[in-house]
Amino acid sequence: MNIFTEFHARIAAILRGIIGSGRLPEDLDLTRFVVEPPREAAHGDLAANAAMVYAKEAKPAFANPRQLAVEIAVALAEDGDVAEAEVAGPGFINIRLKPEFFGRLLGAALEQGSDFGRPATAAQEKINVEYVSANPTGPMHVGHGRGAVFGDALANLLAFAGFGVTREYYINDAGAQVDVLARSAHLRYREALGETIGAIPEGLYPGDYLKSVGASLAQAHGDTYRGSNGEEWLEIFRLAAIDGMMAMIRDDLAALNITHEVFFSERSLTRSEDGDQVAAAIAFLRDRGLVYEGRLPPPKGQAIEDWEDREQVLFKSTDFGDDVDRPLKKSDGTYTYFASDIAYHKTKIDRGYSVLIDVWGADHGGYVKRMAAAVKALSEGRVTLDVKLCQLVKLMRGGEPVKMSKRAGDFVTLREVVDEVGVDAVRFMMLFRKNDAVLEFDLAKVIEQSKDNPVFYVQYAHARVKSVFRQAATLLPDLDCSLAALKTADFSLLGDEGEARLIKIIAQFPRVVEGAALAHEPHRIAFYLHDLASELHAHWTRGKDQPHLRFIYEERRDLTLARLALVHIMAEVLASGLSLLGVSAPSEMR
């Protein structure tokens, strides 16, 4: 049960009654107001801004928003679940709910189990989440890891919310960087044959990770291509290097427990059985009057990618909010990267997705407008594109920057970080800051067993609540703690203020899940879990000094059973939230 949507519906019903009396317009949009937690807990359990939102429409029947708020509050006060509804300030409504209402919510949470928090109505949209899509030119670095974790957690969240989700990786296996990769692999191939290659020439990939590719090529081809012209071996080495790099990337992703259903090759856009899909996408836009031959004006004050003082094939991206029309072909007649991206996104639209989510590095921020323009044009406005930009990760150890990796050549690999601190620490910390904010990741801090380490703090909360049932089995061996018994618990016995705070945080979980899914912001789950863990640890500490507050109170078995039911629900919520983030929920931590 989402108590916020529940009371939104109840207030909407009150407003419909006022509409029926002729004092509000019949066409009033009842989705515009919100019901949310109040800014201060002392103000109640819910806050609604309906009277403020409809202040204009309320005149002349209501001289000001407060008058409308008073009428809504009076109607709410008659609701059997409302203890108090009062008007604050110019017209905000604060609502306090009866304990019995929260008792029913806890009962529903017990019934729903791991489904608690899942939106009640199944979503119909098909969503494509494309994430990672790192160039297959080397191992993944920590920046790639942030996008990988973000995309995977977002896909988990959307699937939990009922959307049809596809997890996709776009392999950038065409273009100049892949030729550079092939030439770098040829150098390592010659090295594997016994040549001394010395310093890696400028412009080639320097990392040791290509040595295994070179060795495989040497084993497969001997010295056939040692001194031959690049035209003879370039395609062979290109394919071998891409296969080797993608195998490495898949291993890196597996270390983070990340999988994709679809790996889509850029090369396939021009080499598939369907013919040249890039040409087809351009023709599609041309047929709609959105492609023309023309000249771009010179850039004003800033460089514009692909600008050349010549007649070019251009997409009318300015018709869809972009700053300048975009070239689709280079001077040598080959397609621009943007043209390939247009064709790729057209395949997503053709596959029936209504929402496309692209997870990119922040350095691609300047590319968002043109891609959004392309999706609008290709789908005629039917498909939504949401580009989520992931900011940099600053890798630290004890406050000092981490040195570069010899294996990668010029960066720290993701695998090195996962191997050092573990997958749970990497995943949680990558999500414990909003994706568009720079993240400082301290390798020393994330393995500390302290409240300053968020992943430990949340996992320890789960381990603590699971330990309560082990303690109950020892202290009260004849107490039935089965789920069936917990469902008979009397929640009206939970009268302590600390218990009430825990219950109210639990009640927010469905709202947090729904909001995070709709906003495409999985960090909200991490923040919520930290808040719940913090309240749990605080309540646990109070119980050390006040035995009657402990979850197991041997003198009151009925109260203990109610508290165990609360503990069970907390364990479910913590485990469910951690699962959405792709983080384990340990039952014990030593």
Curated annotation (Swiss-Prot):
Gene3D superfamilies: Arginyl tRNA synthetase N-terminal domain, HUPs, Isoleucyl-tRNA Synthetase, Domain 1
PROSITE patterns with a match to the protein in the record: AA_TRNA_LIGASE_I
Keywords: Aminoacyl-tRNA synthetase, ATP-binding, Cytoplasm, Ligase, Nucleotide-binding, Protein biosynthesis
Reaction it catalyzes: tRNA(Arg) + L-arginine + ATP = L-arginyl-tRNA(Arg) + AMP + diphosphate
Enzyme class: ligase
GO BP: any one term: arginyl-tRNA aminoacylation
Primary localisation category: cytoplasm
Pfam families noted in UniProt: Arg_tRNA_synt_N (PF03485), DALR_1 (PF05746), tRNA-synt_1d (PF00750)
Region forming the signal peptide: none
Localization per record: Cytoplasm
GO terms for cellular component: cytoplasm
GO MF entries: arginine-tRNA ligase activity; ATP binding
Superkingdom assignment: Bacteria
Motif 'HIGH' region boundaries: 134-144
EC numbers on record: 6.1.1.19
Record carries keyword Cytoplasm: yes
Record text on subunit structure and interactions: Monomer.
Family affiliation: Belongs to the class-I aminoacyl-tRNA synthetase family.
NCBIfam families: argS
Protein name: Arginine--tRNA ligase
Organism: Beijerinckia indica subsp. indica (strain ATCC 9039 / DSM 1715 / NCIMB 8712)
Name of the gene this protein is made from: argS
